[in-house]
Amino acid sequence: PMVIRTARQVSSLDKVVIATDSQEVIDLASQYGFDAVLTSSSHNSGTDRINEAVNILNLNEDEIIINVQGDEPFIEIEVVQAVINRVKQIKENNEDIMITSCYKEISSELADDPNHVKVILDEHSNAIYFSRAKVPYHRDHHEVSTYSGHLGIYGFTKKSLNDFCKLNSSKLENIEKLEQLRAIDNGHKIAMVKVISKSFGIDTQEDLNNALRIFKK
């Protein structure tokens, strides 16, 4: 199962807990030796679901939480570790950052696909905006070779996760269907880490077909 494959990918880093609203997934997790938490089915985003799970687990306020989505079966542990390292740095330096995430260079062809979310960064590697559109637009050039493609890995402390989930859903979040825009719309910062990754999420039937071909190798 994909969620188990994803959990196994990151299990060497630290404790893995699967958050789900499905009893079937709870049973699967138990069968494969993973802890799981049953959450409400009414959440609008995966981050809201993780927040409920974290509160059920009664973790400390400064505990580092990494949200790896269950449809990322090829995510490399080096990518997750890079996000963990940046969250630790933010804690140590007491930086005013709500979320940490990551990105990689993607081709212009991939950037055309709205399922590949693009991110624009400021000079401090914080996110200015995320979009399904092909951004930034280069007025004076017909084509740009690479874009910054967002990877759906999010790092928080328990406190920053709770704070994020207290924010009201924002207009841009609802337009783009990108929950991370909620933080930016409310004036909070998202730190971005550049990584090298061949991973891809399973968002379309084509993605699933590609994944199945890889699994069979």
Model segments located where?
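Conserved core of the sugar-phosphate nucleotidyltransferase
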Residues: 75-170
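Short, high-confidence coil segments that cap the C-terminus of an alpha-helix
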Residues: 13, 61-62, 92-97, 188
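Hydrophobic/aromatic residues located in beta-strands of well-ordered beta-sheets
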Residues: 16-18, 65, 99-100, 127, ...
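Short phosphate-binding loop-to-helix
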Residues: 17, 23-85
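Conserved alpha/beta core of the MobA/IspD/sugar-nucleotide pyrophosphorylase nucleotidyltransferase superfamily
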Residues: 145-217
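N-terminal glycine-rich phosphate-binding loop and ensuing alpha1 helix
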Residues: 1-19
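A conserved hydrophobic position in a structured secondary element of the catalytic/binding core
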Residues: 20-21, 75, 156, 203
